[in-house]
């Protein structure tokens, strides 16, 4: 080009994008969101996370979820898309499918559900008609909104019939489940929940379902990681369909997964997800699911799952040793419900006090709870996140002691606060979390 020649003009498309579009960081492009993210990172680093539905994902999972896969539309399924250019997202989805099948011993897997609620909606869409009767664990006894709560679509469009737990021990009475099923002849029976700490008798549930001609579904969203790690019974051989979120104890990105061994049902679930409920799948999330499934297939994940359960038992026993009531007397999985009534405490007040002390949990209703849902008589505690960062039995015994210290202090106060105790515990929490850093 001669010295007098002018450089070629930018194309209209190039000219419309600022030079920083492909290079600016979040801090440059949106300082307010960058500050919120930095604040959340600090919170996760310096607080002990005991919310049972939360976990800490690997950097690899986050990298996949923040990848260029987010740019791609891919309506349909691998090899049968409504868009071109899907050859690489097909690779990611096929890997996710095959790894999920291997992880849980299932013949078929749908990795496209955007959430746990949507995966359960898809099963309902595939197996039920509006007005059909189905059974699930009562939300007040540890079930989930999508299992027939009156405020949820499942309770509005269908006819839910609930089973509960025994008042005397907080455990599901399988004979009562059988009686309810026989009396109501549901088309679908669901096992699983969000706050039930004991093992599920999948074999008996299937026998009951078969006796009334019902489909049997297991929602293992909370304990899927324990199933993958071999420390919890696998529902896949017993159920017509199994659903799970991919986060929680499975330690992946937020999303859903549907598993079955029945090819005819698999086709129904695929159609229910697309085009029934969703359009284009979130390919960046599916890529992250594939990464998480690969992580869960490694031997060290079995060690992790074992530690989650051991830590939960240690935390429950420590709290019992400090005079706290644990619903059902203990735990077989990753979570527990603490009944605060003997301490004359409410769940909402206790949650806030623990958060001020650097321990994150959630208020939770207990079986036969007289309090309103935003007050509650209990708190729910879980061990997956703190176990991920390296806490063991000794650390959870310390955590149990700190929880007891805070709650006993606010029980003796007039306003539900104990500033000196909360501050002292928060300092010890920071010492503990500093020993087990994340995302360095």
Swiss-Prot record:
The keyword Transmembrane helix appears for this protein: no
GO biological process, one term: glycine biosynthetic process from serine
Residues carrying N6-(pyridoxal phosphate)lysine: 248
Catalytic activity entry: (6R)-5,10-methylene-5,6,7,8-tetrahydrofolate + glycine + H2O = (6S)-5,6,7,8-tetrahydrofolate + L-serine
Pathway where it operates: One-carbon metabolism; tetrahydrofolate interconversion; Amino-acid biosynthesis; glycine biosynthesis; glycine from L-serine: step 1/1
HAMAP family per UniProt: SHMT
Assembly: Homodimer.
Protein name as catalogued: Serine hydroxymethyltransferase
Naturally occurring in which organism (per UniProt): Rhodopseudomonas palustris (strain BisB18)
């Amino acid at each position: 080009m001669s010295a007098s020649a002018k450089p070629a003009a930018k194309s209209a498309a190039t000219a419309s994008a600022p030079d920083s579009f492909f290079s600016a960081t979040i801090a440059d492009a949106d300082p307010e969101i960058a500050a919120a993210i930095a604040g959340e990172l600090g919170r996760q680093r310096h607080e002990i996370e005991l919310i049972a539905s939360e976990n800490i994902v690997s950097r690899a999972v986050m990298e996949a979820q923040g990848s260029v896969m987010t740019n791609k539309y891919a309506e349909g399924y691998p090899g049968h898309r409504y868009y071109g250019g899907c050859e690489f997202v097909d690779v990611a989805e096929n890997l996710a499918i095959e790894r999920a099948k291997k992880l849980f011993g299932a013949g078929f897997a749908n990795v496209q559900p955007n959430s746990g609620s949507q995966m359960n909606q898809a099963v309902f869409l595939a197996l039920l008609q509006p007005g059909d009767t189905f059974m699930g664990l009562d939300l007040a006894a540890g079930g989930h909104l999508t299992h027939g709560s009156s405020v949820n679509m499942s309770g509005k469009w269908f006819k839910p019939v609930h089973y509960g737990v025994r008042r005397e021990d907080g455990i599901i009475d399988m004979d009562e489940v059988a009686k309810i099923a026989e009396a109501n002849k549901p088309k679908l029976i669901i096992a699983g929940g969000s706050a039930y700490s004991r093992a599920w008798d999948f074999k008996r549930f299937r026998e009951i379902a078969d006796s009334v001609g019902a489909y049997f579904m297991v929602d293992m969203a909370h304990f899927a990681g324990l199933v993958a790690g071999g420390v919890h019974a696998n529902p896949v051989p017993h159920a017509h369909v199994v659903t799970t979120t991919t986060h929680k104890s499975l330690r992946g990105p937020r999303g859903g997964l549907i598993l079955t061994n029945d090819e005819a049902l698999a086709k129904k679930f695929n159609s229910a997800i697309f085009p029934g409920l969703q359009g284009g799948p979130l390919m960046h999330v599916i890529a992250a699911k594939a990464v998480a499934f690969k992580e869960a297939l490694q031997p060290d994940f079995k060690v992790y799952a074992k530690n989650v359960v051991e830590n939960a038992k240690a935390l429950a026993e420590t709290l019992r040793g400090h005079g706290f009531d644990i619903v059902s007397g203990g735990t077989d999985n990753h979570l527990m419900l603490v009944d605060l009534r003997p301490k004359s405490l409410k769940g909402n007040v206790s949650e806030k006090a623990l958060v001020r002390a650097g321990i994150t949990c959630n208020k939770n209703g207990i079986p036969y709870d007289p309090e309103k849902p935003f007050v509650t008589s209990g708190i729910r505690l879980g061990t997956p996140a703190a176990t991920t960062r390296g806490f063991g039995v000794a650390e959870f015994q310390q955590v149990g002691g700190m929880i007891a210290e805070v709650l006993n202090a606010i029980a003796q106060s007039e306003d539900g606060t104990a500033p000196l105790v909360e501050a002292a515990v928060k300092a010890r929490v920071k010492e503990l979390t500093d020993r087990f850093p994340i995302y360095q």
